[in-house]
A protein has these predicted regions:
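Polybasic/polar functional segments that serve as interface/processing modules
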Residues: 1-118
């Protein structure tokens, strides 16, 4: 992918994996506090968590959650039935991606995760 704005620093990390803990709205709010504090990412608003609550296909039930960062934001999608998550950390600030992956794996008790910078 061609970098259309080389003068603007951007870092985008995608992490996906199957988790083994029970996830609810509070779990996601607590995760945002956990990961932002450990990566020194500053928020400027409260996390927003949406539950699909029976809309759409059964296999897609779960949560969509976002927290705004001073330097962009973090989004996570949760598929409750499959116990699968997809996390995107998008920042205009550098952060240690290996630590972000390790923190996510630890918090959600993920045995195998895949990740990619883009």
């Amino acid at each position: 992918m061609k970098d259309l704005a080389p003068d603007i620093f951007r870092k985008r990390l995608l992490v996906e994996g199957y988790f083994t803990i029970e996830v609810n709205e509070q779990t996601l709010i607590d995760f945002f506090a956990y990961i932002t504090s450990r990566l020194s990412l500053r928020t400027y608003g409260q996390p927003i968590v949406h539950a699909t609550s029976g809309t759409g296909k059964d296999e897609n039930q779960g949560y969509d959650a976002f927290v705004p960062l001073i330097d962009s934001g973090i989004y996570i999608a949760i598929w409750r039935q499959q116990k699968f998550l997809s996390l995107i950390i998008y920042t205009c600030k550098d952060f240690p991606e290996d630590q972000a992956v390790a923190l996510t794996r630890s918090y959600f008790n993920i045995a195998v995760a895949e990740h990619s910078l883009f």
